[in-house]
Amino acid sequence: SHTHLSGTGHSDLGDILIMPQTGKLQLNPGTAKDPDSGYRSRYSHETEKASVGYYEVTLADNNVRAQFTTTPRVGVHKYTFHGIYNYDGKVLWSTLRVENDTLLTGYRITNGWSRANYTYFAISLSKPIKTYGYRDMKQLKYRGFWRKFDIYNNFPEIAGQGVVTYFNFDNTDRKPITVKVALSAVSTEGALKNLK
């Protein structure tokens, strides 16, 4: 994830988590004792490479090579497909909008080390999204009208307390997917400017 506090001794930011997966869709993190129960992955320190401003590792369970670097305003991810922290009550609200097949925007409001901490984001993808869907893991009871459309599959925007999103890509060319993540503490527009 893109934001962390160093040495706080308690829960930190952990905002805008991206976890590449292949195979069965996993929307929960799982446990350290049973990594197969969720999306977390095993890895070996032997596959790690690190230097100032750069880190890479192979996520063993899905055989995904994950590479990370940064610019002054953007975190850059690169995932090559071969083949978390989860504090309940931390997220007050989050929203994600699919602007087009390679651009995502949104924000998340968290509670913890500060009250109502806003993190806005813009995410650029090097490959177009084929299909996508959402799950709200903490659906709020709503006594309003019954929706006659499916908001959980290929719908452009969702909001909630426990929003989890997945994206499917056509990876027949086996080329890596580069993900650029820009953040702003001010606005989505600020995150979009930082992305450029």
Give the location of each predicted region.
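Accessory carbohydrate-recognition regions in carbohydrate-active enzymes
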Residues: S1-K196
